[in-house]
A protein has these predicted regions:
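Short cytoplasmic-facing helical segments at TM-TM junctions of multi-pass membrane proteins
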Residues: 110-136
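Short helix-terminus and kink motifs of transmembrane alpha helices
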Residues: 63-67, 97, 101, 105-109, ...
């Protein structure tokens, strides 16, 4: 049974990869209206929870770090910690967890219901590819919204850290100058690459 399930998973991954490659070669055949609708549900409607979690994360990191760094008069370096940790690691990971829990579960439930109601079999009977009609729009939507949500989480968490450091007498100009000086484009690109991988795995 385990071998059969594993074989089905491998076959599904192969079909999904084939559909994704076909979408790159022939973008006009992609169901963009469905993709945009799914992206709105998975991305735009997730903004409130992403905002809340990212802001709280930035506040907690800033406060805990600033309390320790104040002993050495180095509160300003908390900006470096927030910038690097959020852009490289925490924002992509947090976004992926939220997307998996919220949108990934919705994807599975929706397609599972269609499977039970034999809608997937009906598509196959009428000569339509279920992977192209059902799976591909969700994969493309996840690939699109995961990096965007991560960048948004970066901004929100950095703003949350800025508010905390204001209470430690660190000026906003100094804070943002420290963040933008230390965080490089390679850090952002590395985080975005992780987002693409997470989005693909979740979808």
């Amino acid at each position: 049974e385990f071998g059969a399930d594993l074989g089905q998973q491998v076959a599904f991954l192969g079909e999904s990869g084939r559909a994704l490659a076909a979408a790159v070669r022939h973008p006009g055949r992609v169901r963009w209206r469905d993709t945009l609708a799914i992206a709105e549900e998975a991305g735009v409607n997730a903004l409130p929870i992403v905002t809340l979690v990212a802001f709280i994360l930035g506040v907690i990191i800033a406060y805990q770090s600033a309390v320790a760094m104040r002993q050495f008069g180095a509160e300003v370096y908390v900006a470096d910690l927030i910038g690097i940790s959020m852009v490289r690691e925490l924002a992509p990971l947090m976004t992926a967890i939220l997307l998996a829990g919220r949108s990934g579960a919705a994807f599975a439930a929706e397609i599972g219901t269609m499977r039970v109601n034999e809608e997937v079999d009906a598509l196959t009977t009428f000569g339509f590819d279920p992977v192209r009609f059902l799976v591909l729009p969700r994969v493309l939507a996840a690939l699109a919204v995961t990096p965007l949500l991560a960048v948004y989480a970066d901004v929100v968490s950095i703003l949350g850290g800025a508010l905390i450091l204001l209470t430690f007498q660190v000026p906003l100009v100094t804070y943002f100058n420290e963040v933008f000086t230390l965080v490089q484009m390679n850090d952002l690109l590395g985080g975005l690459f992780k987002c693409l991988v997470f989005g693909l795995v979740i979808a």
